[in-house]
Amino acid sequence: MKVFAIGDLHLSGNPPTKPMDIFGPHWDNHWARIKEHWANNVTDDDIVFLVGDMSWALRLDEAACDLQEIASMPGKKYMIRGNHDYWWSSANKMRNLMGDAITFLQGYGTAELIQTEEGPRIIAFGGTRAYLCPGDSHFSPETDQSIYERELMRTESALQEMDRAVETLLEQLTAETNMETTGSETSEPLTIDIHTTPVTKLLLLHYPPFNESNAPSGFTDLMEQYKVDTCIFGHLHDQISFKRIPKEFGTTKLELVSADYLDFTLKQIM
């Protein structure tokens, strides 16, 4: 099993009602290019993280065609909200529309046991939109501070749920191990050592976790506090930003996955 990520698909129906090539020729036919790479590299057993700005639609019913396009692609898909996802609705409404085809995350975290080339591994993941950070040139304390603080709360909620999900998964694996070791002699040999199985924490955000100066923020504090291994985010679309993003912040690896930054391919995270 592999883990991929991409953000900022900016879909608008087929044919698109808002073609992205208005932002430059590099966006020409971008969804077809993404789909080709996706279909050729991702299997149904893989995980795909979608970190916001999926559709230009304003309402959930208008976004349905874009979401169904995404759902038709291979892999188990997890999606967070971006700043342009105005169609985003309640969890129940989105679940009723898409069923199990896409799992929508907002201040939510979970964990899964996956099989990688290096062996079994637990990945804990979750996230939310995040927001502009104090010190950013577009940040206004009067209007943005409360939104920033709300997104910090959602981020911490996701991180706490990730930790609880890991504990629950380990308890389940322990119970299964005990059952197998006390079972019949015909039991299959164990392939998972719960004491040595590594855990990787992946935080999904739409906005980067810092301002234009890459200064520490409440998001980076949470990354340190909860020992996040990798933070995956999008939102950025200019060469200056592409060049300024560091590879790491503290002990957390950073992965920028805006579609145009990735040249309209998916980034393999694991």
Where are the language model's segments positioned?
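Generic enzyme active-site microenvironment
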Residues: 6, 51, 80, 204, ...
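Active-site environment of divalent metal-dependent phosphoester hydrolases
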Residues: 10-15, 55-61, 83-91, 111-112, ...
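Binuclear metal-dependent phosphoesterase catalytic core
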Residues: 16-21, 35-36, 92, 110-119, ...
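Active-site-proximal segments of metal-dependent phosphoesterases and phosphodiesterases across multiple
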Residues: 19-21, 60, 66-69, 132-142, ...
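A general structural motif
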Residues: 45, 74-76, 120-122, 196-200, ...
